[in-house]
A protein has these predicted regions:
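ABC ATPase NBD coupling module
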Residues: 24-28, 82-98, 116, 124, ...
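Conserved ABC transporter NBD signature motif
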Residues: 73-81
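Conserved ABC ATPase "signature" region
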Residues: 81, 132-149, 258-259
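Conserved ABC ATPase signature
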Residues: 154-158, 162
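Conserved catalytic motifs of ABC-family nucleotide-binding domains
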Residues: 175
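A short, surface-exposed alpha-helical micro-motif characterized by mixed small hydrophobic
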Residues: 221-223
Length: 269
């Protein structure tokens, strides 16, 4: 299904995050991590949030998911402002909003099988009986390119690429509408990056997923995204269609990111 740009699933408005920083024997000072940014993500779209380390992109992703409280501003999911909701009210949205981390292995308990952990959300949200959970997880493992035998294994037994596939399975098991991808391929070889990105694109088409891709790499955005924004020290300095960012960048930072873009074949092959 094509994205519906007239009907955003996610609407971010003037989102701001300020941390209190207390130094040795000094009064607390304020650090503005994210400074009043706004963007929309259409249903079925992948929106890219590009920035260097420390630019505020991961903090933004966490606020969009209501995993971190915003200092001010709003995030609307289907028209409902989730920044003002209690955790109890947010519970009905949690299964519809999921995240894939840079190192999915770190999100797994090393003492429990990966299959049991992937299936836990089905139990938590009462989406399947205990007798159904294993079969649902096995189906999902198969869909992300893993094997049934992997269900009972532990996270340390898998390669980086396999860990990302497991992280994707864990995120998708609740059949979410919205997925945040936080540097999902940063720690992987280029050939494995391509496999993971192409898997995500296939899954997006199958499931009509809306996605926020957080990355420092404009080549990934070129391959995955419709629209994107560039973050610099917490400020959204440029945003728009990806083609415009690539062909007519307006800021020095965006031009530098364009200059660093890999050949598309290196990502998409």
């Amino acid at each position: 299904m094509e994205p519906d740009f007239a009907d955003p699933l996610i609407a971010v408005r003037d989102l701001r995050k300020v941390y209190k920083v207390r130094g040795d024997k000094k009064a607390a000072t304020e650090f503005v991590a994210v400074d009043s940014i706004s963007f929309d993500i259409a249903k079925g779209e992948t929106y890219g949030l590009i920035g260097e380390s420390g630019s505020g992109k991961t903090t933004t992703g966490r606020m969009v998911l209501a995993l971190e409280k915003a200092t001010s501003g709003s995030v609307h999911f289907e028209g409902n402002d989730i920044t003002t909701m209690s955790e109890l009210d947010m519970r009905r949205y949690r299964k519809r909003m999921q995240i894939v981390f840079q190192d999915s292995g770190s999100a797994f308990n090393p003492r429990r099988s990966v299959g049991a952990q992937i299936g836990f959300a089905l139990e938590r949200f009462r989406m399947a009986d205990k007798g159904e959970i294993r079969s649902r997880v096995l189906d999902m493992l198969s869909r992300v390119g893993m094997e049934a035998a992997h269900y009972d294994r532990y996270i340390h037994e898998f390669s980086g690429g396999q860990r990302q596939r497991l992280g994707i399975a864990r995120a998708l098991i609740t059949d979410p509408d919205f997925l945040v991808l936080d540097e999902p391929t940063a720690a992987l070889d280029v050939s494995v990056q391509a496999q993971i990105l192409n898997l995500l694109k296939d899954l997006q088409q199958e499931r009509d997923l809306t996605m926020l891709l957080i990355t420092h790499n404009l080549a990934l955005v070129e391959h995955m995204c419709d629209h994107a924004g560039v973050l610099d020290h917490g400020t959204l300095v440029e945003s728009g269609p990806v083609d415009d960012l690539l062909t007519t960048p307006e800021t020095a930072l965006t031009r530098a990111l364009v200059d660093a873009v890999l050949e598309p074949a290196a990502v998409a092959s």
